[in-house]
Amino acid sequence: MTRMTKWSAALAAVVGGTAAIVGVTALSADAATTLTVAADGSGQYKTVQAAVNAVAANNTSRATINIKAGTYREIVSIPSNKPYITLNGTGSGPSNVVIVNNRSNAGGYGTFGSATVTVAAKEFIATNLTFSNDYGTGSQAVAINMNGDKGIYRNVRFLGNQDTLLANTQRQYITNSYVEGTVDFIFGDATAVFNATSIYEKRSTGGPLTAARTPSGNTYGFLIYKCTITGATNNTTQLGRPWGPAAQVLFRESSLSATIATSQPWIDMSGNVWQNARFFEYKNTGSGATTNSNRPQMSDSTAANYTPQKYLAGTDGWNPL
């Protein structure tokens, strides 16, 4: 896009009769940017995607999109050429800003394409809001598809049923958040740390929480760290199953309620045998945290290399904690 085309596009961004002048500022790839979204028209943009579109391609400074309280029924895509975007809910809590849609695999979008929000850009941040897919049951329906490296999600609710949260690739950090679903609702190939997060199995018949597909060459997959696991019914919820044969999942120092199927918390998936995956627990507590031959426990010496910092460090020493 030429400079003149960008300028024209910015001037054309009008909300409620007021020109979105900040859209002009956003055209500079080097300038820090703050944009405001409000469903009631009191901001510069009425939709989140319109604000994302206003951020300059190949921006080098953080662009913060403040989203006022409201429900935003839309599909949001953060493309790979728009790094350093923050979506910040300005309501009193994450339930006050909801980005929601109802695409599904059954609807012809495919599992990955069903996502309400797709993040392809690096160093994306989301705070104090909700990502939801309210399709219902009976098909995969993703709330968020995480792809960009070094994604951070703080005080975020992820709502859905089957396949709520797709940690698809790269490194993802989810902290002080809430995730709910029915089947495989934390899944993907990524290296992802869930820290101090509440995870809720909402189906009365239970189901597997995680379905990791960690590449065999990757040491780290999913770390569930100091989280709280609850569910609708007792003794029905599995910690996970291996979407890929080399799946790596560690539940560490977490509170496991009676919802966990204590005698068999790991199960097979699509020909992948759970015993061949890299499934472990370490120092969990709660009535669902018993030990037996079906619950491999990580040793202290090994656990020293399976901390949140180790999971996320990569080759650049990233530490968002």
List the predicted regions and their residue ranges:
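Sequence-level preference for short, compositionally simple segments enriched
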Residues: 32-321
